[in-house]
Amino acid sequence: MPQELVYTLQQLADLLKVEVQGNTETPISGVEEISEAQSHHVTFLDNEKYSRFIKNTEAGAIILSKAQAQKYGHLNKNFLIVSEFPSIAFQKCIELFIPPIDSGFPGIHPTAVIHPTAHIGKDVFLEPYAVICQHAQIGDSSHIGAGSVIGAFSTLGEHCYVHPKVVIRERVVIGKRVIVQPGAIIGACGFGYITNAFGRHKHLKHLGQVIIEDDVEIGANTTIDRGRFKNSVIREGTKIDNQVQIAHHVEVGKHSMIVAQAGIAGSTKIGNHVIIGGQTGITGHISITDHVIMMAQTGVTKSISSPGIYGGAPARPYQEIHRQVAKIRGLPKLEERLGMLEEKVKGLSAQSEEAQITP
């Protein structure tokens, strides 16, 4: 394990380029969440629902926004003050105190299999049993994990990190600084079949590619299929969680986020800055505009043309769901009122019948 690092509060503030308030000589040697932090930890407050911990936390320093520092300044604690987004400064602290642990296999391992026509850039790491197929290209300072396969004619840009047991099929194009977690499969053939007169299914050859642009992250056991004729594309900066299925000829826009176990059917186009909640299912051949948020387990059956928050199955605006839920919650009282009305109607009917019989 790496040696423990210790910074004074002032040194930490200088590294983060933030203001400091309190004892500048306080030693800081680690990071922790606000409810568990001890005197040697730096922590942060981003979500105000955790503000109940700030009074009693034993943290050596707390990262706050300027507005929060004014609000909690009377507590006489050590603060690191940022203009906004304390969580970003805290992430930098994590990177300072907890450096990444590499596999211990520097350079190109002797068991790695490299085709003679493949091109390997400078300072590339190839872990044990990595396979680089014909005419594949690996950019400078990229890292290919143990047992991963880079298919024929595929290209990876600079500073990519492909974790162990990843399969990147043939003719896949991956940009710079892309991270692919273990078990992901990129470029498999899409789920496309034709059924003949005898009811037998024949798989259709998929000729398209998968294009992954710069700064994309792909989670563990996620699958991105190639298109039948056109390419499947993941645009710049998009982050994809674990166990996500992206079908053939899907296009996902820039800086979107797709949460675990979501599935996007073929030929669907997702806009920029879209958030797709966990276990959401999106049908094929539709489009989702920019700045749409889909709650968990949303079922999207048709195109969405207006930004906003959507949920339910079929998907509908969040406000509409709230109104429907409120009405559903009122059903027991409505049933009770209907029962009372039925009894009154029965009573009135009986009185009417008696009045008709009485001479």
Swiss-Prot record:
Do you know which NCBIfam families this protein is assigned to? Answer: lipid_A_lpxD, PRK00892.1
Q: Which PANTHER family match?
A: UDP-3-O-ACYLGLUCOSAMINE N-ACYLTRANSFERASE, UDP-3-O-ACYLGLUCOSAMINE N-ACYLTRANSFERASE 1, MITOCHONDRIAL-RELATED
What is the scientific name of the source organism?
Chlamydia felis (strain Fe/C-56)
Q: Where is the active site?
A: H248
- Enzyme Commission (EC) number: 2.3.1.191
Q: What is known about what this protein does?
A: Catalyzes the N-acylation of UDP-3-O-acylglucosamine using 3-hydroxyacyl-ACP as the acyl donor. Is involved in the biosynthesis of lipid A, a phosphorylated glycolipid that anchors the lipopolysaccharide to the outer membrane of the cell.
Q: What gene does the UniProt entry assign to this protein?
A: lpxD
Q: Does the keyword Lipid biosynthesis apply?
A: yes
Annotated keywords: Acyltransferase, Lipid A biosynthesis, Lipid biosynthesis, Lipid metabolism, Repeat, Transferase
| Pathway assigned to this chain's UniProt record | Bacterial outer membrane biogenesis; LPS lipid A biosynthesis
* Cysteine disulfide partners in this protein: none
A Pfam family: Hexapep
Molecular functions per Gene Ontology: N-acyltransferase activity
Which InterPro entries does UniProt cross-reference here?
A: Hexapep (IPR001451), LpxD (IPR007691), Trimer_LpxA-like_sf (IPR011004), UDP_GlcNAc_AcTrfase_non-rep (IPR020573)
Show the GO cellular component annotation of the record: membrane
A Gene Ontology biological process annotation? lipid A biosynthetic process
Taxonomy, superkingdom: Bacteria
Self-association state and partner proteins as the record states: Homotrimer.
Report whether Lipid metabolism shows up as a keyword of the record. yes
The record's section on SUPFAM superfamilies has: Trimeric LpxA-like enzymes (SSF51161)
Q: Which residues form a coiled coil?
A: none
Protein name, as recorded:
UDP-3-O-acylglucosamine N-acyltransferase
Family of the protein in this entry: Belongs to the transferase hexapeptide repeat family. LpxD subfamily.
Q: Which reaction does it catalyse?
A: a UDP-3-O-[(3R)-3-hydroxyacyl]-alpha-D-glucosamine + a (3R)-hydroxyacyl-[ACP] = a UDP-2-N,3-O-bis[(3R)-3-hydroxyacyl]-alpha-D-glucosamine + holo-[ACP] + H(+)
